[in-house]
């Protein structure tokens, strides 16, 4: 809330936001440890085949398509803070079951599949509730800053998490590293429990008029398609994800098989993407203030992302740095745009619809990831890896046209006024 002078206090002095942000950062770091440790548990302890490890990866990534839409509707029905706490406690138990089963000699691949799927389901519920709860804590004029800090912590976790995971695996084994991740969720739950801010309770008469679960899901999808800025931003994210997964999948193949780089150098080049995410999260608020929060969203993806076209030009020797520069530029631009677009969704959407609207947007945008992976693999087989990378980076840069040809192009700043009321009943 503004102070007596009409100014908004620094977000660094916002106790509840710092507790939320800190708890999420700890669990993000732990989750990145598990990204490395879970397949190692399967390979090292259970001698899983490549196909079985692929099934494990599919179980980890399928939850958004399976439960994102009902998760959003449920998040709008229950207290979001309480939902996040229970999700963290559930993740503590689910992830913690792996080192416990390994200690008593009862660990199986079936359990790992179940852990991967169930933990991803709880992660989806947490993520939807988290994004919906942030506007409860922060004033609308603080959302850009808050979302930028969340993006920074996510990118830092992507950089430091795998290194931390590798160190923990070397020190205490893969199962022990998962025990550390389980502990991170317990710490996050404790941090959230200390938050004092509570959501406004829905009046009982209003709650009685609330439509059923599937009607609410339809409302969320309808809201996304009805709002022209949301509609174009979802189309942008879905298109960008479709192409970026091609780069993430085929980039290592290109660097190892075409340029014959050592795996350590490949990992370093790919990690630069997270560095770009950190820089984008830090710079998002400054660029929004100087250029305009609406204007920077489309400028970042139509102008600042253009060095991404250097990725397929990478060659031997120092020319390999073109890959790193292109990748860091692309992730910087997409993070800046993402912070602005997330802030718009949080500010424009009615609070009691934010969960299902966020879930609907993510269901659409994340749903293009498996499709992009399949299409990228097919194109690489037919046309070659480098040619497919050209298609991917060109398509990723063109994704910004969804934002250019949207109402954002006629605005300097995203509107942060009072959102339109949510519809009551089963019709959008």
Predicted regions and their residues:
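Alpha-helical transmembrane-bundle signature of multi-pass membrane transport and export proteins
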Residues: 1-428
């Amino acid at each position: 809330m503004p102070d007596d002078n009409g100014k908004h206090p620094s977000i660094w002095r916002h106790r509840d936001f710092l507790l939320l942000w800190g708890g999420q950062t700890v669990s993000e770091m732990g989750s990145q440890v598990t990204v490395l440790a879970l397949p190692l548990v399967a390979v090292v302890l259970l001698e899983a085949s490549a196909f079985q490890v692929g099934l494990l990866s599919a179980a980890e990534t399928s939850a958004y398509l399976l439960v994102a839409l009902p998760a959003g509707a449920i998040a709008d029905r229950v207290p979001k803070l309480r939902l996040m706490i229970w999700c963290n406690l559930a993740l503590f138990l689910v992830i913690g079951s792996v080192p416990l089963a390994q200690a008593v000699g009862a660990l199986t691949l079936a359990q790992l599949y179940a852990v991967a799927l169930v933990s991803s389901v709880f992660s989806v519920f947490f993520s939807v509730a988290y994004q919906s709860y942030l506007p409860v804590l922060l004033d609308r004029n603080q959302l850009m800053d808050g979302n930028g800090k969340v993006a920074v912590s996510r990118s830092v976790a992507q950089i430091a998490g795998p290194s931390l995971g590798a160190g923990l695996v070397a020190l205490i084994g893969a199962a022990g590293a998962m025990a550390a991740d389980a502990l991170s969720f317990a710490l996050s739950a404790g941090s959230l429990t200390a938050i004092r801010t509570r959501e406004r309770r829905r009046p009982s008469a209003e709650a009685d008029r609330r439509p059923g679960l599937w009607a609410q899901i339809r409302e969320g999808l309808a809201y996304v398609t009805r709002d022209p800025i949301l509609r174009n931003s979802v189309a942008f994210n879905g298109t960008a994800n479709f192409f970026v997964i091609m780069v993430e999948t085929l980039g290592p193949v290109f660097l190892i098989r075409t340029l014959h780089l050592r795996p350590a150098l490949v990992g370093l080049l790919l990690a630069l993407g997270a560095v770009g995410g950190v820089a984008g999260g830090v710079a998002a608020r400054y660029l929004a203030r100087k250029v305009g929060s609406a204007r920077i969203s489309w400028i970042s993806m139509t102008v600042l992302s253009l060095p991404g076209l250097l990725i397929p030009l990478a060659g031997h020797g120092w020319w390999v740095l073109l890959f790193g520069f292109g990748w860091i530029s692309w992730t910087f631009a997409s993070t800046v745009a993402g912070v602005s677009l997330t802030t718009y969704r949080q500010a424009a959407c009615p609070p009691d619809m934010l969960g299902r609207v966020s879930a609907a947007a993510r269901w659409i945008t994340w749903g293009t990831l498996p499709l992009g992976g399949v299409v990228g693999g097919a194109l690489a087989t037919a046309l070659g890896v480098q040619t497919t990378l050209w298609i991917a980076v060109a398509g990723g840069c063109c994704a910004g046209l969804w934002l250019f040809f949207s109402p954002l192009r006629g605005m300097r700043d995203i509107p942060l006024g009072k959102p339109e009321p949510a519809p009551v009943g089963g019709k959008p």
